[in-house]
């Protein structure tokens, strides 16, 4: 908004920024604060998480109001707003994560838009969160009518279950088994399938936390046929790689997240995607857990390690240092 055209009025307070770089406040469009994942509760709530964000210049976050099974979207939004009550030190907003779909939920989407929720997240993995392809198709149609944007966690949940079963039968229980349960094709297949569904509906969509070259190739093919696809990746996929799953003494559990860390080749492809404008946003997917009291729950079984790593504080410095 242009308030006034003319000479700048004398300031009441002047900060000397000589030799410094001035940025607008950064936005982290993908965080998970005060969230019960079904396995553990995240270590950060909205108080500690937003304070950490501000330390390095993130002044706005967008978290997820996640619907529990059997819960209405209205109740879910109220619950998540209650979590933020008098706790947030920075600006915040919500995407709505839809985990169940029926006519009642469908009827609530207009109320969500009137409440300021115009973006929605769906999961293709995690039994307590994921939806089938038919529900994804119906939600995309409803979102199109409302002018909303749908983002999706693209991993093939059925194949993850099959791989995990095989690994456990082979007595592979260390953190190294986690990336083996989610090879790059697990992401690429889900991205390709989701984009085909979106093509049928003719609606813009958002791919969250892209981690693989194969996934980026699927997105390129979709764009060539005219689809509008917005893409997010995260610092962990740009700066960390799969070698960290070979650390000793359970240290690799610190890097158990989904999608998992990938190869150097995948890293290079993602950086190229950023340079070419194929990836629009770098968010954190901040989902922090305490190593001693939470990650170590899975010391004898990798499937019990809470998935997620932090990032809400360090993203600006990391991306400026390695990406500018």
Question: Which ranges hold each PLM region?
Answer:
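A conserved active-site cap/scaffold subdomain adjacent to cofactor or substrate pockets
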Residues: 193, 201-204, 214, 251-283
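Histidine/acidic-residue-rich, glycine-tolerant segments that coordinate divalent metal ions
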Residues: 67-78, 83-200, 214, 238-248
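Histidine-rich, glycine-flanked metal-binding segment
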Residues: 1-24
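Hydrophobic faces of well-ordered beta-strands that scaffold small-molecule active sites
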Residues: 25-31, 61-63, 92-96, 118-122, ...
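Glycine- and other small-residue-rich loops at beta-strand/loop junctions that grip anionic moieties
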Residues: 38, 128-131, 152, 183-187, ...
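Metal-associated gating/positioning segment near the N- to mid-region
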Residues: 17-87, 104
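His/Asp/Glu-enriched, well-ordered alpha-helical/loop segment
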Residues: 176-202, 254, 281-282, 288-324
């Amino acid at each position: 908004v242009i308030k006034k055209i003319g000479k700048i009025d004398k300031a009441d307070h002047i900060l000397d920024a000589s030799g410094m770089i001035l940025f607008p406040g950064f936005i982290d469009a993908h965080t998970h604060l005060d969230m019960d994942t079904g396995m553990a509760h995240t270590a950060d709530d909205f108080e500690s998480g937003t304070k950490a964000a501000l330390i390095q210049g993130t002044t706005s976050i967008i978290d997820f109001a996640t619907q529990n099974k059997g819960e209405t979207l209205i109740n879910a939004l109220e619950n998540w707003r209650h979590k933020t009550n008098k706790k947030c030190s920075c600006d915040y907003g919500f995407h709505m994560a839809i985990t169940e779909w029926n006519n009642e939920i469908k009827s609530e989407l207009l109320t969500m838009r009137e409440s300021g929720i115009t973006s929605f997240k769906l999961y293709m993995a995690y039994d307590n969160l994921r939806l089938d392809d038919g529900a994804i198709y119906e939600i995309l149609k409803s979102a199109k009518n409302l002018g909303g944007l749908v983002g999706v966690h693209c991993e093939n949940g059925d194949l993850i279950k099959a791989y995990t079963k095989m690994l456990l039968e082979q007595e592979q229980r260390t953190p190294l088994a986690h990336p083996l349960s989610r090879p790059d094709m697990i992401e690429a297949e889900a991205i390709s399938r989701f984009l085909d569904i979106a093509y049928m509906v003719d609606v813009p969509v958002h791919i969250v936390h892209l981690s693989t070259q194969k996934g980026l190739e699927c997105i390129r093919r979709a764009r060539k046929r005219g689809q509008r696809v917005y893409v997010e990746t995260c610092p962990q996929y740009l700066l960390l790689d799969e070698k960290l799953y070979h650390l000793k003494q359970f240290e690799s559990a610190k890097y158990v997240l989904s999608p998992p860390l990938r190869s150097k080749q995948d890293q290079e492809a993602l950086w190229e995607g950023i340079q070419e404008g194929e990836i629009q946003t770098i968010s954190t997917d901040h989902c922090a857990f305490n190593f001693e009291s939470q990650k170590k729950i899975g010391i004898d079984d990798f499937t019990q390690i809470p998935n997620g790593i932090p990032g809400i504080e360090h993203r600006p410095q990391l991306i400026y240092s390695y990406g500018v």
